[in-house]
């Protein structure tokens, strides 16, 4: 009887966990198919920095950004989830509220840092030069899920479900001269930072809020 009850309890726990996982992904849309660059456009510089391998966008090479162009409607309030893995000493980033730019570091929007062991002290989850995280919350050579949630004037960043940053943009904030870093609207982009960095991005999904 005890074994029977234990089996039922285990089944109920598993069922609840599966239901929670399904609910947590409800409303999300995949924006990278894992096979092609459909819906994505690279900058015009160093385009060979980008490839697709094992279902992931792979960034390795001189500076080049790849932008999501698959939806003409800009994203304002949203919840973005990306599975990320870095090799040691790599630097990269996930941009939001940005727009296509043919070369250079993107001026529009924010960069959410991807960096566990690169020499730059601003680590994974930082809103670059706005609200920085000094301690890494993820590890090289292991996949993690990086989430960016924008609602109103708040930006929340999670790594594997744990909040690593919550930023409230102050009233009257103005765009910067060189880099705007101002909550507005726009698209997403990933960064290939330098030849010494290798970063994989996959399972890219987003939900409008």
Name each region found by the language model.
Residues 1-4:
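Positively charged n-region of N-terminal signal peptides that target proteins for export
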Residues 20-209:
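Carbohydrate-interacting regions of secretory-pathway proteins
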Residues 7-17:
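Bacterial N-terminal signal peptides
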């Amino acid at each position: 009887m005890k074994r029977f009850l234990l089996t039922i309890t285990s089944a109920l726990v598993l069922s609840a966990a599966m239901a929670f996982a399904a609910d947590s992904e409800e409303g999300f849309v995949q924006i990278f198919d894992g096979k092609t660059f459909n819906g994505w456009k690279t900058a015009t510089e160093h385009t060979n920095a980008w490839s697709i391998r094992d279902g992931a966008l792979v960034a390795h090479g001189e500076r080049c950004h790849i932008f999501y162009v698959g939806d003409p409607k800009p994203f304002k309030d949203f919840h973005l989830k990306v599975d990320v893995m870095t090799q040691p000493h790599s630097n990269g980033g996930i941009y939001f509220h940005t727009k296509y730019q043919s070369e250079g570091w993107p001026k529009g929007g924010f960069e959410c840092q991807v960096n566990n062991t690169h020499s730059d002290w601003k680590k994974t989850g930082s809103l670059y030069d706005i609200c920085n995280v000094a301690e890494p919350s993820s590890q090289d050579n292991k996949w993690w899920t990086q989430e960016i949630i924008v609602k109103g004037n708040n930006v929340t960043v999670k790594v594997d479900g744990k909040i690593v940053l919550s930023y409230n943009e102050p009233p009257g904030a103005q765009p910067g001269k060189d880099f705007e870093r101002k909550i507005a609207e726009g698209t997403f982009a990933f960064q290939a930072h330098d030849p010494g960095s290798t970063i994989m991005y996959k399972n890219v999904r987003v939900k409008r809020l």
